[in-house]
Amino acid sequence: MTELSPKYNPAEVEAGRYQKWLDADVFKPSGDQKAKPYSIVIPPPNVTGKLHLGHAWDTTLQDIIIRQKRMQGFDTLWLPGMDHAGIATQAKVEERLREQGISRYDLGRDKFLDKVWEWKDEYATTIKEQWGKMGLSVDYSRERFTLDEGLSKAVRKVFVDLYKKGWIYRGEFIINWDPAARTALSDIEVIHKDVEGAFYHMNYMLEDDSRALQVATTRPETMFGDVAVAVNPEDPRYKDLIGKHVILPIVNKLIPIVGDEHADPEFGTGVVKITPAHDPNDFEVGQRHNLPQVNVMNDDGTMNELAGDFAGMDRFEARQATVAKLEELGALVNIEKRVHSVGHSERSGAVVEPRLSTQWFVKMDELAKQAMDNQETDDRVDFYPPRFNDTFLQWMENVHDWVISRQLWWGHQIPAWYNAEGEIYVGEEAPEGDGWTQDEDVLDTWFSSALWPFSTMGWPDTDVEDFKRYFPTSTLVTGYDIIFFWVSRMIFQSLEFTGRQPFQNVLIHGLIRDEEGRKMSKSLGNGIDPMDVIEKYGADSLRWFLSNGSAPGQDVRFSYEKMDASWNFINKIWNISRYILMNNEGLSLEEAESNVAKVAASEAGNVTDQWILHNLNETIAKVTENFDKFEFGVAGHILYNFIWEEFANWYVELTKEVLYSDNEAEKVITRSVLLYTLDKILRLLHPIMPFVTEEIYAQYAQGSIVTVDYPTVTPAFENEAAHKGVESLKDLIRAVRNARAEVNVAPSKPITILVKTADSELEDFFTSNVNYIKRFTNPEKLEISSAIAAPELAMTSIITGAEIYLPLADLLNVEEELARLDKELAKWQKELDMVGKKLGNERFVANAKPEVVQKEKDKQADYQAKYDATQERIAEMHKLVK
């Protein structure tokens, strides 16, 4: 047995430990065919950069689950991997190239992709280093990447099969266009933000100049693509105009007036300009009336030649120029300022442009129906918390067809080929013969990510061992922000292609926020690098904080104060471990287990030993129950209370009565219970704190704690009598300590303690354990009896089954205490007067920073609480001397 260093130093504890685990292959599946499999696939982080605190939280929860299941004897697989993240990674590489004055077009597709692969290799290495720092017990022999050949094969098969079923189609429709990334976006890649904008009201004159029709738009630059104006066919103001024409301002082109129910007589003037190539509703109107589709923008958001004098201008520059021209022509009626919702690209942040474009789509109605129907079966996916099942179903009920093509170079190139005759060939391999050109677009990143749970297991080969044994996976851990992006798509793709759900459970967590509750972002500058936190506090401290920060589905607020508390808790565990191991005298764990069995059988030990084993049993049961429900915060609270309060503050202190005695037989039993309980604590903690538990475990046992058995309940430890007795003993000791503190009597001063109880069993228990009472209360005189009369002047405390009297004469000089309290009251009054004067100054309140004013208000509340408490104490003292 070696000795723990005097001070807990996480850097020393964690250094080299991860590599030792990897060298020992402890993270690989056991291969035990009799064991029940338990598998998790890691939500693959994007190879766009370093991992953030949200990744640390997400992976910590997964590691807790997989480590516990491994210890419980499951055949566990935690499969790691990364996502190519098409649009995001390409944007990062293009940004790096721009800094060198190079564009992707300068390089060409192949050389540009070489640069992206270099980026991927660089950041994949960084991510794996971060995983190691976090202590993640993943099986690297099964690591996957979404552009691996095996996964690419799965992607091609899914695309081709859906195409053959008619569930993937190509067509020209209005899509969300990102002018910065120059690619299409799906609906859920668009973030809507309220922005300051305007409605521009303008007149379109009838061709005979008899009257003008007023229309309004937030995007006047699109008017060059107007091909009609629409009125409601039932609107008496305009129905006689249907079939006539108006003159499109600036362009001086005649466009028809059509009757369509899209025009709402109750909204605005009841007249709507129709721009089929730049608005989804207008596109539908155009389809109904066979109107032309005029696209007036380039893919970078500049105006094309159809915008006339405005060609080449950025769309927002063109907006102002168009409005100025309309005003010059007298066609601008007014500008109505208003805040409205505008879509922004989730990746680039650019304002999204609705744009007519030829794209590939997934038809969603049947896939969504399968997913919703499955939630009514025994094969459903269980969400934790359950409310997210409703979120999932609601989205599925309202889902639109999914645009899956992206105008990028980095990603899975669409397996479709075209020839000069206009034929399309879709297949897993290129068509035979010459004259075929592959579609240059790539698939949406989420298309390949949706196959992650089964493509990583070897699908479409369903005979491989991993697919047969570990699919469906057991649990997915992910944030609520990607239920739509990813979780839902994995479910419907898995059901369609494997006939099974992709995972049995989904544990949803929230977002990491800063101390003020704000989302962490670059713009706010409040992001936290988890590696910086680990460098200061250690991975175990960070993991403890992340696992205890919130309940499933809730956000967590990061603060360094909480990190300090996490470190302090581990330091406490370290110190009590040192105490136990230093007093261990060479006792082995096997010997300790044998001696503990004697305690459970009441053949050895004392009531405090039986009490701690009973409480350990309860702790094991409650922690396991909450782990099974993914309530790690509740489990952590139970562990913290047992370790710090019951074990360290009470049992370890109680054992000193034995360890400092001359009774060698009792010492062996006490050491055994200490070592046994510590061992179970370390095993319970290991899934959360892998490094420090391994370090301490190695001091008294062989092998790694990673693969030892997880604690289970021992029926023989149940002992309600011992539990009840020691809890009463603790109540008595606490009551005396509190009374001392109330009247400022030092623990070192001996006092008289009178314990009155009519419960003969309790009296016998206190009497037989009087040594513990004396050790913790320092009495000059201690009486325990049913015949005690209450003294006239005494502090009285009532606990279950007993009354405790502390004669006042032994405690303090009442007159001196009252004088001291009067001085204290005057002090708090003075502080209240000072802060009250400051807050009563209107100039101070008006001109000082809000946080300064709040600080003074906090002071006032604190002083008032102290003043009130002192007043109450004075009143109590007066009652005692009456």
Swiss-Prot record:
Motif ('HIGH' region): 45-55
Subcellular location: Cytoplasm
Gene3D superfamilies listed in its UniProt record: HUPs, Isoleucyl-tRNA Synthetase, Domain 1, Valyl-tRNA synthetase, C-terminal domain, Valyl/Leucyl/Isoleucyl-tRNA synthetase, editing domain
Residues that coordinate or bind ATP: 522
Pfam families for this protein: Anticodon_1, tRNA-synt_1, Val_tRNA-synt_C
Swiss-Prot/TrEMBL catalytic activity: tRNA(Val) + L-valine + ATP = L-valyl-tRNA(Val) + AMP + diphosphate
EC numbers for this chain: 6.1.1.9
InterPro entries, per the entry: aa-tRNA-synth_I_CS, aa-tRNA-synth_Ia, Anticodon_Ia_Val, M/V/L/I-tRNA-synth_anticd-bd, Rossmann-like_a/b/a_fold, tRNA-bd_arm, tRNAsynth_Ia_anticodon-bd, Val-tRNA_synth_C_sf
GO terms (BP aspect): valyl-tRNA aminoacylation
Disulfide bonds: none
Residue ranges the record marks as coiled coil: 808-882
SUPFAM superfamilies registered for this protein in UniProt: Anticodon-binding domain of a subclass of class I aminoacyl-tRNA synthetases, Nucleotidylyl transferase, tRNA-binding arm, ValRS/IleRS/LeuRS editing domain
A single Gene Ontology CC term: cytosol
Motif 'KMSKS' region: where in chain: 519-523
Assigned keywords, A-Z: Aminoacyl-tRNA synthetase, ATP-binding, Coiled coil, Cytoplasm, Ligase, Nucleotide-binding, Protein biosynthesis
Molecular function terms from GO: aminoacyl-tRNA deacylase activity; ATP binding; valine-tRNA ligase activity
Main function: Catalyzes the attachment of valine to tRNA(Val). As ValRS can inadvertently accommodate and process structurally similar amino acids such as threonine, to avoid such errors, it has a 'posttransfer' editing activity that hydrolyzes mischarged Thr-tRNA(Val) in a tRNA-dependent manner.
Entry's family note: Belongs to the class-I aminoacyl-tRNA synthetase family. ValS type 1 subfamily.
Complexes and interactors: Monomer.
NCBIfam families, alphabetized: PRK05729.1 (NF004349), valS (TIGR00422)
Record remark: domains: ValRS has two distinct active sites: one for aminoacylation and one for editing. The misactivated threonine is translocated from the active site to the editing site.
Protein name per UniProt: Valine--tRNA ligase
Organism: Streptococcus pyogenes serotype M18 (strain MGAS8232)
